[in-house]
Regions:
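Polybasic/polar functional segments that serve as interface/processing modules
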Residues: 2-111, 115-148
C-alpha cells in the first residue's frame, strides 16, 4: 500500500510541476493586454538608441551600459530560445531608417522586441515590450516604442 501511495504522490507532484510550468505561458497572452514598451537603456529614448545602435560595440566589448548588441545569429537564437519570439513578417520592410528596424514577437508569451540590424552582420536590441497580438497592426508596436 505504501508503494502505491508513493507512486500516486510522485505522479501528483509531477503533474503539478507540469501545470505550474504551463500556466505562465497560458496566462501571458490576454486579448485585452495593453501594449507597453521599454527602451533598452532606461532614460534614453528609443529613437536615440536606434541612431546610436549603428556605432555601438558588440556587448562583450562594451565599456559601459548599452543595449545588447551581438552577431545576428546570437540575437536571433536568444530571442527564439529565451522568449519564443520570431520575426514578424511584413514589419519593418520600408526604406526609412526607422522602418529597417525588425519586429520580433511571441504569440505564446505576448512579448515583442525591436531589433536594429547593422551592415556588419550584427544587431542591437533597442526596445522590448508586452501586449503582442498577431491580430494588431504592426505599426502599433513601433508607435508605442516611439518610432514612426
Amino acid at each position: 500500500m505504501t508503494r502505491i501511495a508513493s507512486r500516486i504522490a510522485r505522479l501528483g507532484l509531477a503533474g503539478s510541476v507540469v501545470l505550474s510550468m504551463a500556466m505562465p505561458a497560458v496566462s501571458a497572452t490576454r486579448p485585452d493586454q495593453p501594449v507597453q514598451a521599454w527602451p533598452a537603456m532606461a532614460g534614453v529614448p528609443i529613437e536615440v538608441l536606434l541612431e546610436r545602435a549603428q556605432t555601438l560595440p558588440v556587448s562583450d566589448m562594451a565599456a559601459g551600459d548599452q543595449p545588447y548588441c551581438a552577431a545576428d545569429a546570437e540575437i536571433h537564437q536568444t530571442l527564439k530560445h529565451d522568449f519564443a519570439e520570431s520575426p514578424v513578417a511584413g514589419a519593418g520592410q520600408d526604406t526609412t531608417a526607422q522602418d529597417t528596424t525588425e519586429l520580433w514577437a511571441s504569440d505564446q508569451m505576448g512579448t515583442w522586441t525591436l531589433v536594429a540590424p547593422r551592415a556588419d552582420g550584427t544587431s542591437c536590441i533597442i526596445a522590448s515590450g508586452i501586449g503582442y497580438d498577431a491580430g494588431r497592426d504592426t505599426a502599433v508596436y513601433f508607435h508605442t516604442a516611439g518610432l514612426r
